Amino acid sequence: MVIASVLRSYPQLQAAMFARNIAAGERQAAAGEFDLKLKGSSDNGPAGFYETYRHAIGLDQPLYSGGQAFAGYRIGRGDFQPWYQERQTNSGGEFKAGVRVPLLQNVDIDERRAALWAAQYGRQLAEPDIQAQRIQLVQEATYAYWEWIAAGESYRITDRVLHLAEDRGDRIRSQVEAGLIDPPELTDNRRLIAERRAKLADAQRKLEQTAIKLSLFWRDDSGNPMIPTADQLSAIALPPQPDSNHPMDTTDIEAALRQRPEITAFSWQQKILQVELSQAENLTLPEFDAMLTAAQDVGEPSSSKRDKSQLEIEAGLFLEVPIQRRKALGKMAAVEGKLAMLAAKQELVKDKIAVDVQAAQVGLQRSMEQVVQTQMSVELSEELAARERQNLDAGLSDLLKVTLREQYAAEAAQKLVDALLLYHRAEADLRAALGADAVVQE
């Protein structure tokens, strides 16, 4: 009930889930580098010896395989300088299309694709953070729930020993009036009642405070905190009978390494760095591109030579080589260093996960044994207290001995509550160490 409330409406977990929106937005922004671009220009010279009017519009499409394709239309009218005759077109203008493709650098990867792939991996990287938040919050909510249950048990114990003293008051009064015991016995019992009422008030305080703390995790469908009431308390659960000879389950460590989000996060971080390394290696190659264009003027010829009326096809090669390649080599060295650092951190985290699981297993096992022994102590203490009360009624004991026996029984009962709380906390620790709550089961 409490865990379902946390997974449904806890604000911190909801805030973590918005990381998905952030990552999705970054991925969309990276994909925007492949958007079709519309370009246009208008360049006019209405005054002067040469009056020229030039207008152009075109489309530019970056290709996912590298390079780009382009197409456009332009028209140039007026009296052009002799050295700018290529700006002039036939009366209907010029249509042009072409493609530029990489032959060495940017064939398998380029800056656009590297950014897109890194953003895609970054979107996956948001999930481990959400899972880590979920594990932590489930653990904290489990702690808060069992602390509230334990506070309720402590209140019941304190209330029970108070009623024992109150019920005994009438019997002691009648015995004093009959002259069987001295009057200070009645006064001492009144003192004991006052003391136990004070302890009950303190137990009530702890119960109310733990209920308020639990309301942080227990929320209604609208996400508003709900403070649980005392009538919603249930008895604190007893653990199964422990097996002191039960060996450490190594499969738990294997399961934790599969389920813990830290390992998944390292995997996606490594993929992002591998993309960066591939792009750095790509930059070590010469920039060698091929381009093919075709252009066709339409309309009335702009000159008697009709030199713009034929279909024009151009093919070209473009080469650019950074001699030292320091930018590429420097990036490669930096990324390789990051990969080595990430691998070292991953090994340490794996060791810590194994330690977490083993420590949680030990904690759960020993707390189970502690519960069993404490439960035995409670039974024996209650038996002694009941016998001492019988002796008091028979005149074979005094109030001091009864008080001590009841105090020992109450302390034993409280120790059992503490042991049970420790057990349930250890159980939550083991689930957290295993990463069992990383993914919600639909």
Label every model-predicted segment.
Residues T52-R54, E94, Y143, E312-E314, ...:
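Transmembrane beta-barrel architecture of outer-membrane proteins
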